[in-house]
Amino acid sequence: MTLSDFEKQRQENIQRNKELLRQLELDSLNDSISREVPKPKPKAKRRKTENARVKTEPIMPSRRSRRLAGSTMEDSEEDKQMREEMEKAEERKRELEKLKSTRLFGDFKLIDLVVNKQGEFKNQDKILKAKEKDNEIKKEEKEEIKKEEDSTDSIDLSRDNEVLQKLQQLGDRFSAGDFYEMIKDTKSKYDDTVLQEKREEFDRVKLYERFDPLDIKITQQRITSIAFHPAKDDRVVVAGDTTGYVGIWAVDAKGDDETSPHITILKPHGKAVARILTPEQQPSSILTCSYDGSVRRLDLKRLESTEVAYLQDPYESSDYPLGVSDINVADNNLLYMTTLSGNFYRYDMRSPFKQGELLRLHDKKIGSFSINPNAFHQIATASLDRTMKLWDLRNISQKNSYWSEFDDKSPHLYCTYHSRLSVSCVDWNHDNHLVCNGYDDTVNVFDLSGSDKLPLVTEWSKDYETEKKKRTTIEDGVPEKLEALTRIKHNCQTGRWVSILKSKWQLHPADGLQKFVIANMNRAFDIYDQKGRILCHLTDPDRMTAVPAVSMLHPTENWCVGGSASGKVYLFE
């Protein structure tokens, strides 16, 4: 068979490549490489060494028979005494932890309520016994209390006593007449020129520089309420937290130790302190209310803490407190209170407290309420039920509670504002403007000073009602038509670890410009006028490390203070 031309060419290429390889001597090189590679030598076998056995002691049973152990069935006197002391110590510890969350009974000196850095009473034994009711204290225990009162000097209270003495001196210098200019109405018209001047004035306000804000820890836990005392020369800031502690900071106090702020922490309550206020005609008194159901007065002159009122559920057989959510004072003697259950109560502080009939304002928690400073019979309430309501206390009847699931009496309802989510707070100023905010991320300003739609709020009769729908359901029968003058977008989503944001008016602005403050979640304060125009955004990013959620303006001066979740305070001056 003859080969094709292509096959012939392929055979020639093969022969030519072989000849080329032979000339290069690659075959011999390959053989030499294979000869130079040594064969691996077998590894020497090593003798295995056995691990030394560790001698283990037999495990003894956790419980052994006394008979096998050779001991007697009865303990010695020393063992009995030691066991009894341990049991008493454990019982005392449990009792103290339980009593920490209960309210105080009776009157105390402020020095007795001082706590240490761990939040424990420095006069712990005295408070533990005093929290028991008088009829449960034995004669021997009363003698022990008297001895402990005599031995108070042995406890180191020098620093706390120094702060309280400064507060006492401060209280002695207060008179109601000193605040006449503050109390009388200061109404003045202003235009954009005044607005610009105010913004420039607030631009000069700076964070307090005498101490680092991280050192101004005024309470043990998250701050839930704060108050700025009306004094201007010797300023005082008071704050309460979630566990009943109340801290007092003498801002301008000076002493031998200038390395730390002058702060004293007390514990007058067993649960969260909901509100702190100073009555206008009694500047030496500080009122506090708590979820433990009590309202107490701190007297800066006498340095005493006394119980003003205590609310309990009338439908419960045992002593079941009604948590007080907010308080306000009308006409210097009338104390108004709201509860976590939606109740309202009035009490004349000139007479001994005896709980009377509770009024029904909401079926859910009232988070905040405010009195019209121009008409004490009118109040506004903000509730968890997503409404803000206006009431007339002159007209109280069971018929007025037609909207409620309960049969309690209610005041006359003027009108209602409905929100998408719960309303956190409401506040009333001297120009008949309301401000409220809630979890719908808005701040609403209402003008009730008289317009074409609504007459002046102080002229409303005791049966006045705004327009309402034809009543087919309970909700339709409630008067509505309360529209906001201004609606401001504001982030109010505080979450679990930050206190609820609440907008508050300045009580008696010395400059005549009505303004309110609300904390900003970006660690700042926002201040607006009553037309909803922002005046300033107070912040210090380098030194403010937390949200000053609970905020307040000084009653007259343009100073702002706020408390954080860690118990620290930020002051702009």
From Swiss-Prot:
PROSITE patterns per the UniProt record, alphabetical: WD_REPEATS_1, WD_REPEATS_2, WD_REPEATS_REGION
Positions in coiled-coil regions: 72-152
Gene3D superfamilies with a match to the protein in the record: YVTN repeat-like/Quinoprotein amine dehydrogenase (2.130.10.10)
Chain residue ranges for the region called Disordered: 27-94
An annotated GO BP: regulation of DNA damage checkpoint
Annotated disulfide bonds: none
GO molecular function: DNA binding
Positions of WD repeats: 218-259, 268-308, 319-357, 361-401, 418-456, 495-538, 542-573
Keyword Repressor recorded: no
Alphabetized UniProt keyword annotations: Coiled coil, DNA damage, DNA-binding, Repeat, WD repeat
Descriptive protein name: DNA damage-binding protein CMR1
Keyword Repeat carried by entry: yes
GO CC list: chromatin; cytoplasm; nuclear periphery
Role according to the record: DNA-binding protein that binds to both single- and double-stranded DNA. Binds preferentially to UV-damaged DNA. May be involved in DNA-metabolic processes.
Basic and acidic residues: bias regions: 79-94
Family the UniProt entry places it in: Belongs to the WD repeat DDB2/WDR76 family.
Organism: Meyerozyma guilliermondii (strain ATCC 6260 / CBS 566 / DSM 6381 / JCM 1539 / NBRC 10279 / NRRL Y-324) (Yeast)
